[in-house]
Amino acid sequence: MAPAGVSLRATILCLVAWAGLAAGDRVYIHPFHLVIHNESTCEQLAKANAGKPKDPTFIPAPIQAKTSPVDEKALQDQLVLVAAKLDTEDKLRAAMVGMLANFLGFRIYGMHSELWGVVHGATVLSPTAIFGTLASLYLGALDHTADRLQAILGVPWKDKNCTSRLDAHKVLSALQAVQGLLVAQGRADSQAQLLLSTVVGVFTAPGLHLKQPFVQGLALYTPVVLPRSLDFTELDVAAEKIDRFMQAVTGWKTGCSLMGASVDSTLAFNTYVHFQGKMKGFSLLAEPQEFWVDNSTSVSVPMLSGMGTFQHWSDVQDNFSVTQVPFTESACLLLIQPHYASDLDKVEGLTFQQNSLNWMKKLSPRAIHLTMPQLVLQGSYDLQDLLAQAELPAILHTELNLQKLSNDRIRVGEVLNSIFFELEADEREPTESTQQLNKPEVLEVTLNRPFLFAVYDQSATALHFLGRVANPLSTA
């Protein structure tokens, strides 16, 4: 019998192959039993609902109430424990949810460039955070709202039977497993190579009751869930209060505008993600270097530099190159640079799509000296706008059936994803075989003009981040 790890890898490869065979915008070739209710859980739900008393509720504390700061180290430790307890089925479920998140993320990324317009700065989007936010809302949804959310999450249903319904608890647990698999890899030497923290803020109008089972269910996705109440009648003031609260609690750069909200909004559902990746063997150059925003404009930016054997591929037909820089054994940073700066939009369309990971098979080892900007990026976006740009159903319109979240009238003002993304040097140890590289054969790769990037984890087949850098000093 093959070892469990080999069997798992083989099964994941099959999942990837099946996904690659799917055509069109919707991908249904998956073992959906991993994420839907089975007959046993349906029977348990039916028994639990028979004569069940009303779910207990509570009114969130005011936003000005004192709150302890988020302990990111403790968060990482919890994720490592989650990863350590995963069995084979858990890992398969995480891989499947990772792929579903990729498909949704690519679709939204491919369409919402119209919302951004021409990006002159830098921006970053998280497919897993988008999927997690929508799965969290699905946890609180009923009837047609739940149907629509299940459809956009990529899981079809044949009828109204329980066994066709997405199991929100399985999905949210799998999303936490996806995070844990990424973080745990860099902890073998007790030094965190990767940091990934997720915090959910549930902001309600004063007096609105939240159901306790809903908030408790969110803890399957992230242990830090912050329900708070505030007045939405002055939207600018409310946005400032939310920003101040989140920055005080997390210390991260955040962004809340409430642009899509109205004075009668009763809910802002916000997901905040902080990622920090340390590039092993890289160092920060002593002086800032030129980064060419276009043919005539440059800015001085901090640059990282490192040398090693990296996976690389140059596409001479479509004029772009890819360099894969490892964070850990299975997690990596993908750097995509057009050979000509004017081709950035074209290359983005070629690489950030559902079958884009196929070109990873073409990568091969190459001795490389890589120079690239040190990245500190912040991106915030309202999923209501992104889904509209992606021409998806009006899932997040203001009037939703969220009766598993609250029995009170819900009017959604904002569904925010806020990303704080950092890449920095880790000079503790050099990259592999640096001193053995034959200098004349070393390829110089310098990212001093617009480029694309992605953070990919093969262990969960998950693209955690997709980004575009036209100017490292400016957030789009």
From Swiss-Prot:
Q: Which residues form the signal peptide?
A: 1-24
Task: Quote the PTM field.
Answer: In response to low blood pressure, the enzyme renin/REN cleaves angiotensinogen to produce angiotensin-1. Angiotensin-1 is a substrate of ACE (angiotensin converting enzyme) that removes a dipeptide to yield the physiologically active peptide angiotensin-2. Angiotensin-1 and angiotensin-2 can be further processed to generate angiotensin-3, angiotensin-4. Angiotensin 1-9 is cleaved from angiotensin-1 by ACE2 and can be further processed by ACE to produce angiotensin 1-7, angiotensin 1-5 and angiotensin 1-4. The disulfide bond is labile. Angiotensinogen is present in the circulation in a near 40:60 ratio with the oxidized disulfide-bonded form, which preferentially interacts with receptor-bound renin.
The UniProt entry, under Pfam families, shows: Serpin
Q: Which Gene3D superfamilies match?
A: Alpha-1-antitrypsin, domain 1 (2.30.39.10), Antithrombin, subunit I, domain 2 (3.30.497.10)
Judging by the UniProt lineage, the source's domain of life is Eukaryota
Q: Which UniProt keywords apply?
A: Disulfide bond, Glycoprotein, Secreted, Signal, Vasoactive, Vasoconstrictor
Question: InterPro entries from the entry?
Answer: Angiotensinogen (IPR000227), Angiotensinogen_serpin_dom (IPR033834), Serpin_CS (IPR023795), Serpin_dom (IPR023796), Serpin_fam (IPR000215), Serpin_sf (IPR036186), Serpin_sf_1 (IPR042178), Serpin_sf_2 (IPR042185)
The biological processes this protein is annotated with in GO are: positive regulation of epithelial to mesenchymal transition; regulation of apoptotic process; regulation of systemic arterial blood pressure by renin-angiotensin; response to angiotensin; vasoconstriction
- Disulfide linkages recorded for this protein, renumbered to the chain, are 42-162
The GO cellular component terms are: extracellular space
Sugar attachment sites are 38, 161, 295, 319
Q: Where in the cell is it found?
A: Secreted
Query: Does Nucleotidyltransferase appear among the keywords?
Result: no
Spell out the molecular function terms from Gene Ontology.
Answer: serine-type endopeptidase inhibitor activity
- Biological role stated in the UniProt entry: Essential component of the renin-angiotensin system (RAS), a potent regulator of blood pressure, body fluid and electrolyte homeostasis.
Q: Which family does it belong to?
A: Belongs to the serpin family.
Q: What is this protein called?
A: Angiotensinogen
